Structure formats: C-alpha cells, structure tokens
C-alpha cells in the first residue's frame, strides 16, 4: 500500500501462477509476469488510492493473467480447473459507490472470458458460515441476464 509519508509514493501488484497438469509427467510450469508498478497512487481527488482499490486492481489483474495463460494452453489441455487464492466474489463494498458497479462489471466480463476459454473457476471459503456462501449459491441459481 502507498505510504503517504514516503518521498516517492508507489505501489506494485505482483501476480504469479502455477500450471499443474494432472496425470502428466511434465513438471508444473510457473509464470510470473513483471509486476505492475504504479507511480500514480492517487485518486481523482488527490488522495492516496485506498487499499480496497488496490485489492480490486490485483483481483482483476489475476484474472487477466489467468486468461492469458488459458489462451497459451494446448488445445488438448482440457478440462481446465483454475483455483484462485481468494474468495470467488469480488469485494467492492469498500470502494466508493460510483466505482462499485463499474468494477463488478469488469470482473464479470473477465469471468465470462475465462468461461469462454473453457475453464472452470474456483476460490475458497474462509468463513463457511458467512453470507458469502449463501450469496454465491443464490447467484448460481439465477439466469445470466438476472445477475
């Protein structure tokens, strides 16, 4: 997170992935593109960008890297199951209201691209009794147009 007292504020987002081919004798591939370094850590009002915005940027960047990796896989490398090191739902509640829908739409578009590339996406449930599980189950039962 940017330090408001630093001489030169910045932040970086580092994304990595591991491709494991179940049943194959090939060793897993690791992929770590150059980090996304941001020297403009201020929002439109000149305030330091919030940790919530950085988290959303990271989550979107993870899906973009995942899509890039999916498009590089051999055609016979199916089925593909992806596991994100976080919850599946994008946390936008901490963003300013006017950004929430925009970021959610970006996230859904990226998830659609993952699906169009023939992959399934999974995350983890860190609190099984939380409302996240119920919310995801409710979303799963809706038609795509209703989401």
What feature does the model see in each segment?
Residues 1-47:
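Acidic, metal-ligating active-site segments
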Residues 40-147:
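Long, contiguous domain-sized segments
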């Amino acid at each position: 997170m940017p330090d408001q007292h630093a001489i030169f504020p910045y932040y970086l987002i580092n994304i990595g992935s591991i491709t494991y081919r179940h049943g194959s004798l090939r060793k897993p591939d690791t992929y770590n593109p150059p980090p996304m370094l941001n020297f403009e850590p201020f929002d439109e009002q000149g305030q330091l960008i919030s940790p919530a915005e950085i988290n959303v940027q990271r989550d979107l960047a993870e899906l973009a890297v995942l899509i890039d990796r999916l498009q590089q896989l051999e055609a016979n490398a199916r089925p593909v199951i992806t596991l994100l090191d976080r919850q599946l739902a994008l946390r936008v509640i901490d963003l300013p209201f006017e950004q929430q829908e925009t970021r959610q739409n970006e996230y859904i578009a990226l998830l659609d691209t993952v699906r169009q590339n023939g992959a399934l996406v999974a995350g983890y449930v860190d609190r099984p009794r939380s409302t996240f599980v119920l919310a995801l189950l409710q979303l799963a039962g809706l038609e795509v147009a209703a989401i």
